[in-house]
Amino acid sequence: MKIEKININEIIEYSGNTKEHPEWQIEQIKNSIQEFGFNDPIAIDEKNIIIEGHGRYLALKELGYTEVEVIRLNHLTEEQKTAYAIAHNKL
């Protein structure tokens, strides 16, 4: 697995994302990024669609980031992408 940097505007939010991120949560994520840095790459697929990391993506956009680190999970099937997202949102 390789971490790469891409322009934040190339990332696409997954339209089927069921997890809501209220503003207070985005604020907490922003505070964490400001204090500790951004060290948890966003997981995306081969089309740059977010699999996991919507909250971090929203926080980074609000903070004005133009490039972000991502991990491409091109090898996952659609079912595996869904399972991955669910598993990470339960943690």
Regions found by a protein language model. Name each.
Residues 1-91:
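Short, charged/polar connector segments at secondary-structure boundaries
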